[in-house]
Amino acid sequence: MLKAQLATTIAFVMCCSSVQAETTAKATCEPTAEGSRNLVVSFYTQALIDKQVRAAFDTYVSPDFVEHKPDVPNGSRSAVVDFLEGLVTELPGARWEILRTVAEKDLVFLHARFSPAPGAPPYAIADVFRVDNCAIVEHWDVVGPPRDGMPNKNSRF
């Protein structure tokens, strides 16, 4: 059994790098709510916190990915990559921070803080990802921009 796993691993290494990255991510993913949470946190960290958008999509996101964000034309995977890479280029000092996560069945909820520049007021972000077969297949978000004079003194974070 161990020799078979080793042979399989060697065969995967000989494949192209993006296939290898995807295979590695899927091999380490557990098809559970907690496994999906770990996958989404790894994706979010690489794509937005580390600002390696394309590499994160190559590793964690299905080719058939569907985006529901209204700012992204046609909701395709390639459109999201272009949108996020443009955002990272336009706002080089931007910072994303994961505050909390919740995972249930095939859905992962992420509550995040987005600061477009050092010292800028933060946005509150709620992201929802659907995971299938250890790949992100769908995404929704709600973005709350900064507000002046908030009547509620409880923070959104």
Give names to the regions the model predicted.
Residues 7-17:
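Bacterial N-terminal signal peptides
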Residues 1-7:
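Bacterial N-terminal signal peptides that target proteins for export
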Residues 19-157:
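C-terminal and inter-domain tail/linker signature
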